[in-house]
Amino acid sequence: MVNVLINGYGSIGKRVADAVAKQDDMKVIGVTKTKPDFEARMAVEKGYKLFAAIPERKHLFEEAGIPVEGTLDDIIEDADIVVDGAPKKIGKANLENVYKKHGVKAIIQGGEKAGDAQDSFNSLWSYDRCYGKDYIRLVSCNTTGLCRSMYAINSVADILKARIVLIRRAADPNDVKTGPVNAIVPNPVTVPSHHGPDVVSVIPELDGKIMTSAVIVPTTLMHMHSIMVETSGTNRDEIIDALAKTPRILTLKASEGFDSTATIIEYARDLGRSRYDLNEIAVWEESVNVVDNEVYMMQAIHQESDVIPENVDCIRAMLEMESDNLKSIEKTNKAMGLIK
């Protein structure tokens, strides 16, 4: 049983904490918050030991009546690994100023740059490369989703060229500061977007073969990808079969009512998923087509949760708990109650 510390109990951190708590080979020894908000109070109510991420703010938790065990410095030495859930750029600072200082292994999230850590993690592609490493970046929700679908295609044919258009959600449901509310925004307006190079950080063999562009639209539920991949040769049945065999990919049919991201999220709700999380990505089966060996398909990504099982697998890889990535994936999925 290894000790996991969650530094930053926010959108990602609270989900990783719950996922780790469900495993039988790891435990959450504590979570941190920078301020005494409702998430901090709920962390304590769920049984997590709460620590102040910033020592000077410990008294704020006490004044708010939220039990706090101490500060980050009081618990970090007990951790075998830290999962950083801090906002973009803060993770890198934590890595340099906190984790390396204390000599503790750490996972930073996809908002940081590839060069900020020793490698970039995806359970299907880079588990072996990250095995035993000290500092790893867990790639973003979009990159995670693309890595899964590229894995499926690559299992039946060589990828010659990949072109992806990303239709990104404007903000998470709890974010009232981000937009747009009434616009479609190229983000970035230049091509390629950062997503292609980010995929290459996980799959180096796609260097020079992947091109991405991205726009932001006024929705909060999910991202969507329109994928076009030139291959060495395949057909629709092979791709459908490959998607079915690839972990953490669901093939859903519009003919059965899955005609939008809204109905996919409704499905997650009906499954009884906590926070309506869909850790699996969803591919519309009717969108899958192959013309002259070029694969076309559309997929949806739940931006708050598809990276969560990958964090668990990354812990096992970095702490050398399981050498077989597929066994780790299966173990994580079973504990979290994933469909596949």
UniProtKB/Swiss-Prot annotation:
It is found in: Cytoplasm. The active site is at C141 (nucleophile). Keywords: Cytoplasm, Glycolysis, NAD, NADP, Oxidoreductase. GO terms for cellular component: cytoplasm. GO terms for biological process: glycolytic process; lysine biosynthetic process via diaminopimelate. Its EC number is 1.2.1.59. One of its GO terms (molecular function) is NADP binding. It catalyses: D-glyceraldehyde 3-phosphate + phosphate + NADP(+) = (2R)-3-phospho-glyceroyl phosphate + NADPH + H(+); D-glyceraldehyde 3-phosphate + phosphate + NAD(+) = (2R)-3-phospho-glyceroyl phosphate + NADH + H(+). D-glyceraldehyde 3-phosphate binds at S140, C141, N142, H195, G196. Pathway: Carbohydrate degradation; glycolysis; pyruvate from D-glyceraldehyde 3-phosphate: step 1/5. The keyword DNA damage does not apply. InterPro entries: DapB_N, GlycerAld/Erythrose_P_DH, GlycerAld_3-P_DH_AS, GlycerAld_3-P_DH_cat, GlycerAld_3-P_DH_NAD(P)-bd, Glyceraldehyde-3-P_DH_2_arc, NAD(P)-bd_dom_sf. The keyword NAD applies. NAD(+) binds at S11, I12, G111, R169, Q303. It comes from the Archaea. Its main location: cytoplasm. Belongs to the glyceraldehyde-3-phosphate dehydrogenase family. Homotetramer. This is Glyceraldehyde-3-phosphate dehydrogenase. The gene is gap.
